[in-house]
Amino acid sequence: MKAPSWRRAVLKVGSALIAPDETGVSTKYLLPIARFINECRERGQEVVLVSSGSVAAGRKHFNFEHKKVPVAVRKAMSAVGQNEMMGYWSRFFDSPCAQLLMTHSDLRDRARYVSIKNTLNRLLEHDILPVVNENDALATDEMKVGDNDNLSAMIATLVDADALFICSDIDGLYDSDPNLNPDAKKIPVVEQIDESIYSLAGGSVSSVGTGGMRTKVEAAEKATSHGIDTYIVNGRKGETFESLLQGDIPGTLFRRQSDPISNKKHWLRHTLVAQGEILVDEGAEKALIENGASLLSSGIVDVQGDFDRGDAVLVRSANDTDAIAKGICQYSAHELMHIKGQQTEDIAEKFGYSPITEVIHRDDLMILEDS
């Protein structure tokens, strides 16, 4: 079985390949990856590199023997390690490399999201290799994506990539844990990601990075829902990249969905973090799901959480615990508590101001039912 062709790809390199023994950057696994990227670019294909490993690369400069390191020291490790890591990547390519460090808050803000997209597109147009990483030196917990598997999926969506390659020290997805079962079989192709696939993912098998197989499956779900074929491959094996260049599938391919969601809907669903919930009645639920309507104040039963205008919220039926939609709210939680259940035309008369007609406009709403 041959791999689907692609024009633009995101390639994520895990910490276990950057600094396998945590004594600084090693070229052992990076050179074959760099050769693969060079070959792809010579063929006219575009690549965005998402490179983990700044903390692992910088660890050698600090006197910490154990894995548990204070947060402030990890940030310092990241600061020095990122510089070393970029130095290596820059030496591997004839054309320039560009460093982009970002946090989840950069991706959650729509204006910054679009700005990052434009910057990446301009870099690719000028044959410059973008090297992306999370800004571990500055990010706080609430600002972090948390792992570069999911970050790579967000970047792949942002640049409208055709393929996402997640390179780690894992051969792919298996039908059971290969560390426990010597007869475990690798799954070459996954057509649909569901709970059965997540049940196979288990936990992390890398001693260096923050992501395991589950985060890779999460990333694959994000990417495939936007029409991006996603591969999990072993970057420690040089033959992996020879196989990819020949159009073969050396790891596990998660096939793109045939009906991908739009870039904005994907951003709503997978990037924005919900700050509260809006409970709606049966009439509003039906209007949202069956008619693709906007959410109006008259259908709101209750409001939970403390959110501001422009925040993302979940919408769920007052009779169920499962969320039915996610969207950007045009009112704060405090404002909604005063207008919930009110007809739009009654709000102006009662409160003395002309209201925004839609609490959540349908263009800012993503239905989650059956997701």
UniProtKB/Swiss-Prot annotation:
Binding residues annotated for substrate, in chain numbering: 52, 136, 148
Catalytic activity line of the entry: L-glutamate + ATP = L-glutamyl 5-phosphate + ADP
Molecular function as annotated in GO: ATP binding; glutamate 5-kinase activity; RNA binding
Domain PUA: 275-354
Subcellular location: Cytoplasm
EC number(s) on file: 2.7.2.11
Keyword Protease attributed: no
Keywords on record: Amino-acid biosynthesis, ATP-binding, Cytoplasm, Kinase, Nucleotide-binding, Proline biosynthesis, Transferase
Major location category of this protein: cytoplasm
GO CC aspect terms: cytosol
Pathway membership: Amino-acid biosynthesis; L-proline biosynthesis; L-glutamate 5-semialdehyde from L-glutamate: step 1/2
Keyword hit for Magnesium: no
Record-listed ATP binding positions: 12, 168-169, 210-216
Pfam families hit by this protein: AA_kinase (PF00696), PUA (PF01472)
Record InterPro entries: AceGlu_kinase-like_sf, Asp/Glu/Uridylate_kinase, G5K_ProB, Glu/AcGlu_kinase, Glu_5kinase, Glu_5kinase/COase_Synthase, Glutamate_5-kinase_CS, PUA
Reported function: Catalyzes the transfer of a phosphate group to glutamate to form L-glutamate 5-phosphate.
NCBIfam families (UniProt xref): proB, unchar_dom_2
Family affiliation: Belongs to the glutamate 5-kinase family.
Protein name per the record: Glutamate 5-kinase
Gene from which this protein is expressed: proB
